[in-house]
């Protein structure tokens, strides 16, 4: 799943951003669900989160997209996010001790789906002019 990822600066405000892909091991997640265990093994494993190229923070990011093997799977405007960045950071800061350098993954649009070993994953983040400001190009290995 594709997400806008923010890196916090000294004042706990967005400093930079990139596109990211967050993956889930559905077998481990399902086992955890069945047994009432935490989802840690399904969400936190080597290669589970891949980051694209970093760029300076800009509130005018308008779109994130994800293709798998050249097939578009996710494409959404950031204006459709459930929570805007300011509200998200306010909420997180109330519950967690945020620090400069922390990464905030902001959530994913509809269209998540399975990957297979060898799948090519390509994700982008574009500005208001449609210019790609962050991208990642990866091959699924797990």
Model region roles, listed by residue range:
Residues 1-103, 111-142:
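Catalytic-core "active-site belt" of small-molecule-metabolizing enzymes
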